[in-house]
Amino acid sequence: AGFPFFTEFEIFDRHCSKIKNTEHKLDYVSICTPNYLHDAHIRYSLRLGADVICEKPLVLNPWNIDQLSKIEKETGHHINTILQLRLHDSIVNLKKKVDASSENKIFDVDLTYITSRGNWYYTSWKGDIHKSGGISTNIGVHFYDMLQWIFGKVTRNVVHVMSHDRCAGYLEFQKA
């Protein structure tokens, strides 16, 4: 029969109210909504008594993470996030090579990602920095996560350019 899918929060809320009074319960809520709604949808889902699977970014403002941690403790439910680049075969293989290298090996990495965004992008929530978090949060987070997962913790971070449609800088990791 599949799982219910909702494009409107109000209908999802109604669905949750209906099943709350049955023997069924929500184990997980998967949140795939615009970035600026994640925080409220995570809070709602935890308070419903469900664990959460949320696409990136969990929140737009780092200070909201502390409150989400408190709600996790209060409810006993957990938040999980998805950063799918870690699952690509080529990325998994690269991580294995880096992990197998000598402990002192420092890699030289140049990552450039260029993609065009049509007018749709700038007229949608994705083009609004207050709703998406900007290009670094909306798109760059995948690359930051991938690089940190492969090469270790960030030891240096310098931003050279930051605008609505581009970001450039220098990142140094434990192994790159």
Residue ranges and their predicted role:
Residues P4-S69:
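Beta-loop-alpha module in the N-terminal Rossmann-like domain of NAD(P)-dependent dehydrogenases
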Residues T155-S163:
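Conserved S-adenosyl-L-methionine
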Residues L85-R156:
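Predominantly a Rossmann-like dinucleotide-binding segment in NAD(P)-dependent oxidoreductases
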Residues Y28, A40, Q67, D89, ...:
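Alpha-helical elements of Rossmann-like donor-binding domains used by nucleotide-donor carbohydrate transfer enzymes
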Residues I65-L85, E103-D110:
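Rossmann-fold dehydrogenase core element
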Residues Y170-K175:
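Active-site beta-strand termini and strand-to-loop segments that position acidic
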Residues I31, V52-E55, I79-I82, V158-V159:
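Short catalytic-loop micro-motif centered on adjacent basic/acidic residues
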